[in-house]
Design a protein with these regions (language model features):
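Solvent-exposed alpha-helices and their adjacent loops that cap or buttress functional pockets
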Residues: 21, 36-38, 60, 90, ...
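Internal nucleotide-binding/catalytic subdomain
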Residues: 154-295
Length: 429
């Protein structure tokens, strides 16, 4: 069996790392991949937004299953194209992918099906949105979101009216996010603990992976601007078995039923960003693919074979999988370039990788890296994810930080508090 993974980040490295353990050498291909992936799979340079080029690659390589990492190919309709060509692909159709590609669509979908989420209003007219801010329609802080895909940077939490008005102007008048900000969602600010919930879906049924928690802000103690994610841990002590049942009953099942009734059954990975409020779980956002950096913490927990589950889900015939999952805590810490998520320099040599790759219960997943001669150099904002695992969160955290402290490059930035929330929760539970 041959598998194709699309993408070039640490998420895709984690996916390839897992699948490469289940298949003979050379059976897992990644496009375009990165230097870390190239050590365990075959990388083919390719623009994955060019859907026809991806389809041609899948045909020429006799690919049995394609797994889509990032959201853009899904939003462009790669699953629809592959389905017409009779090619198996793990991911939702373009229509179903609107759960992520349009926040307005997602909010309206949830409202129609009574799926718990924040109160909201959609605006495309700046004066109307500013009027809502001045009236304090949703109170303060207030959350403003660009409707379309904005690379994880399209959300602004405004603490007061002046900040909210400026956010409205930057989105709707100055077009800060381009076409992604033609309309915006304004919603109430929710209080509680955030969690990420992954479910593999076959259109009718869903199988949950261990819940995780992300760390979006650039600095310790959740300070500074939002990023794509500076670290994650799993399993989340906040997501108890009873809460998991509520998430399935109040969110996952209504999503699957609603999309099935609309004629667009959801097959693929459904990522539910949750706020665990005092009244129960509420949806912050949907993503239609594996999250980054949560995937780096979650996938190593799956000790059984993942490929058969993904293939069965893609074909709409998953049923109830039987797959072994570790209970050991896993902690993923991101090493980023100085200046990220703003402008940052790249091209610095990365040291310490060989030493870290020999450490037990540690995994290194490449993101913004490039091979230059014999050296690995920085090539992006988020450079690497380092994952530590252990019998307790104390051990997993210590492993992750011991490893990441061996890695060197000019301007390396690391949050020092990844996993501390889990530590406090597990100690008080």
């Amino acid at each position: 069996m041959k598998v194709l993974v699309l993408g070039s980040g640490a998420r895709e490295h984690a996916i390839v790392w897992k699948l490469a353990q289940e298949h003979p050498p050379g059976s897992v291909i990644c496009a375009p991949g990165n230097p870390g992936i190239a050590k365990i799979g075959r990388c083919i340079p390719l623009d994955i937004a060019n859907l026809e080029a991806v389809r041609s690659l899948a045909v020429s390589e006799s690919i049995d299953l394609t797994i889509v990492g990032p959201e853009l190919p899904l939003a462009l309709g790669i699953v629809d194209m592959f389905a017409k060509a009779g090619l198996a692909i793990f991911g939702p159709t373009r229509a179903a992918a609107q759960l992520e590609s349009s926040k307005a669509f997602a909010k309206e979908f949830m409202a129609a099906r009574s799926i718990p989420t924040a109160q909201y209003q959609v605006y495309s007219d700046a004066p109307a949105a500013i009027k809502a801010v001045r009236e304090g329609r949703f109170g303060f802080p207030v959350v403003l979101k660009a409707d379309g895909l904005a690379g994880g940077k399209g959300v602004i939490i405004a603490p007061d009216g002046a900040t909210a008005e400026q956010a409205v102007r930057s989105m709707l008048i100055e077009r800060r996010f381009g076409d992604a900000g033609i309309q915006i969602v304004m919603e109430e600010y929710m209080e509680g603990e955030e969690a990420s919930f992954f479910a593999i879906c076959d259109g009718r049924t869903a199988w949950a992976l261990p819940a995780s928690q992300d760390h979006k802000r650039i600095f310790d103690n959740d300070c500074g601007p939002n990023t794509g994610g500076m670290g994650a841990f799993a399993p989340s002590p906040c997501v108890t078995p009873s809460l998991k049942d509520r998430i399935f009953g109040e969110i996952i099942e209504p999503v699957l039923n609603g999309l099935s009734e609309a004629g667009t059954p959801y097959r693929g990975l459904l990522y539910v960003g949750l706020m665990l409020t005092s009244t129960g779980p509420k949806v912050v956002e949907f993503n239609v693919r594996f999250g980054d950096p949560e995937t780096q913490a979650v996938l190593p927990m799956i000790t059984g074979e993942l490929t058969p589950i993904l293939l069965a889900a893609a074909k709409g015939e998953m049923g109830t999988p039987k797959c072994a999952v570790s209970t050991w805590p896993h902690v993923a810490v991101v090493a980023a370039s100085q200046g990220y998520p703003g402008s940052h320099e790249t091209g610095f040599t990365i040291g310490g990788l060989e030493k870290v790759e020999q450490m037990s219960d540690v995994m290194v997943f490449h993101a913004g890296t490039q091979q230059v001669g014999d050296d690995i150099k920085t090539a992006g904002g988020r450079v690497l994810s380092v994952v530590g695992r252990g019998e307790t969160f104390d051990v997993a955290i210590a492993k992750a930080y011991e490893a990441i402290d061996h890695i060197t490059f000019t301007g390396k930035h690391v949050r020092r508090d990844i996993g501390k929330k889990a530590l406090s929760k597990s100690q008080t539970s």
